[in-house]
């Protein structure tokens, strides 16, 4: 007959913890942050990495939680519109609103939030959101055979541009928030805006290191 204390035998092995669990417990390592740890790419500012926050066709407004690096649910859109294309940000960039540079990426399929891809800038959409500058880079997926040949926003069908403009003009109307979209600008304006945001980010890092 077995002894009730057999289960408490000192010879019984404890479950093994892998290195990831151990490092998390000891807090000796930190998970990669998509804004700061992912490189922008060797061809930037023309071709660059984009971290997708919101999938094409989604009504959920996801966004980067800057403290944790995770993608969080910000809100559900108040109107019936959905995001016309995949939407995200360029790592290692910084804009005047203290956020990374926003990008709308045209491609065939929706991409899961948190994934990253290579994109090419084809234009810039100047935008004012509630009185503050909030420009968007318009880009195409550099590895999508249907879109990678586009190099200028003027090459897009007029309906596609109207769709993008109307989405951003309307998506906050039911929240009583004003958004104004100006005329689309050419690729060089987008490239210059990205380079400026890269320079701002570099200054931010240098300032942080001096503290």
Curated annotation (Swiss-Prot):
Name this protein carries in UniProt: Soluble inorganic pyrophosphatase PPA1
Presence of keyword Lipoprotein: no
GO MF terms, alphabetically ordered: inorganic diphosphate phosphatase activity; magnesium ion binding
Reaction catalyzed: diphosphate + H2O = 2 phosphate + H(+)
The protein's enzyme class: hydrolase
Main location class: cytoplasm
Family that this chain belongs to: Belongs to the PPase family.
Miscellaneous notes: At least 2 separate genes code for soluble pyrophosphatases in potato. This protein is probably encoded by the Ppa1(a) locus located on chromosome 12.
InterPro entries: Pyrophosphatase, Pyrophosphatase_sf
Cofactor field: Mg(2+)
Source organism of the structure: Solanum tuberosum
Entry keyword set: Cytoplasm, Hydrolase, Magnesium, Metal-binding
Residues binding Mg(2+) 2: 102
Binding-site positions, substrate: 61, 75, 87, 171
GO BP terms: diphosphate metabolic process; phosphate-containing compound metabolic process
Job of this protein: Catalyzes the irreversible hydrolysis of pyrophosphate (PPi) to phosphate.
Catalytic site positions: 83 (proton donor)
């Amino acid at each position: 007959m077995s002894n009730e204390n057999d289960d408490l035998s000192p010879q019984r092995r404890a479950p093994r913890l892998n290195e990831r669990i151990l490092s998390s417990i000891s807090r000796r390592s930190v998970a990669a942050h998509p804004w700061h740890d992912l490189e922008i790419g060797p061809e930037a500012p023309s071709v660059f990495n984009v971290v997708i926050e919101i999938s094409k066709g989604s009504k959920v407004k996801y966004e980067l939680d800057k403290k944790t690096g995770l993608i969080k649910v910000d809100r559900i859109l108040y109107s019936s519109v959905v995001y016309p294309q995949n939407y995200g940000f360029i790592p290692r960039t910084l804009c005047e609103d203290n956020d990374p540079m926003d990008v709308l990426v045209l491609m065939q399929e929706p991409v899961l939030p948190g994934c990253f891809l290579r994109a090419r800038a084809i234009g810039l959409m100047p935008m004012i959101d509630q009185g503050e500058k909030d420009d968007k880079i318009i880009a195409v997926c550099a590895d999508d055979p249907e879109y990678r040949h586009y190099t200028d926003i003027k090459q897009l069908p007029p309906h596609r541009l109207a769709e993008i403009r109307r989405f951003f003009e309307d998506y906050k109307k039911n929240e009583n928030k004003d958004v104004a979209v100006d005329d689309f600008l050419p690729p060089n304006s987008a490239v210059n805006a990205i380079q400026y945001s890269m320079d701002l980010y570099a200054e931010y890092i240098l300032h942080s290191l001096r503290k």
